[in-house]
Amino acid sequence: FGPTRNPWDTSRSAAGSSGGAAVALATGTAWLAHGSDMGGSLRNPASFCGIVGLRPSIGRVAHTIAAAVDRNLGVQGPMARNVEDLALLLDAMSGEHPADPLSLPVLPNSFLSAARSGSKPKRVAYSPDLGITPVDPEVAAVTRKAAQRFAEAGVIVEEAHPDLREAHECFHVLRAFDFALSKAALLRSKRDLLKPEVIWNIEEGLKLTVEQLERAEAQRVAMTARTLEFFDKYDLLLAPATIVPPFPVENRYVAECAGKKFDNYV
């Protein structure tokens, strides 16, 4: 079928991995859609295609047995053409499931009622880069305008972000570990059918040491604690959904952003 193209400019990528879902929404082919997200697979397509996508907190949408080991890194989430539709789908998706001990109960008030309430946050943090990543100037400008909209509505907006300095190392290790656990058998039996990026990620996971995994889990715990403390002060954190605008559809992944080159797709 070829690559999934951006509905606003077919020379550009729709992003992935839920690019097809985002395009279906943007073109009116679908009313609601589902996406999965470990490292942006739901958020990047939503951003590239001009629709709404939400990566929920872990446990908000329950995993099933089919999720295998991927229970505390990747999540399932809703995609829609507007916030109210997305909230409606999240209400339908959320809730406890006996197959997932980390799943959370349904909240007393629905997400749809919250979306329709018209209430606004009191204090919002804004960060163009979360202190950890380059961001294309065009993306940074769009994010800055969004922050200004909050300020114009009377919300206190301050430039701040939680301390996420270990995020890249932690995510690289835990993602590779997940790939090794869930896909090593595929590498052994069907290597010729796997794309180079997946092969690389599995092999990175197979090379990990116990010490690296221990360090990554400790980093995750520390970042979670610092982020929870951060939200004692702020109601929301505004940040770019993706670091670049839609790139040419021929490109396999983002190779450079704001002068920084990347040697892998993660």
List PLM regions with ranges.
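A short helix-breaking turn/cap at a secondary-structure junction
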Residues: V52-A141, K145-A146, L164
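Short, surface-exposed loop/helix-turn segments at secondary-structure junctions
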Residues: T4, L102-V106, R215, F247-V266
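Short glycine/serine-rich loop segments
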Residues: F1-E96
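Acyltransferase
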Residues: S110, A114, V135-A160, K183-S189, ...
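Short, Asp-centered acidic motifs that coordinate Mg2+ and/or phosphate
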Residues: W31-L32, D235-L237
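Short helix-loop capping/hinge segments that flank enzyme active sites or metal/cofactor-binding pockets
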Residues: S113-S127, L174-L228, P240-P245, V249-R252
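Short, well-ordered beta-to-alpha junction loops that form the rim of enzyme active sites
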Residues: D129, P162, Y234, P240-I243
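Glycine/Thr-rich phosphate-binding loops of Rossmann-like dinucleotide-binding domains
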Residues: L42-R43, P134, P246-P248
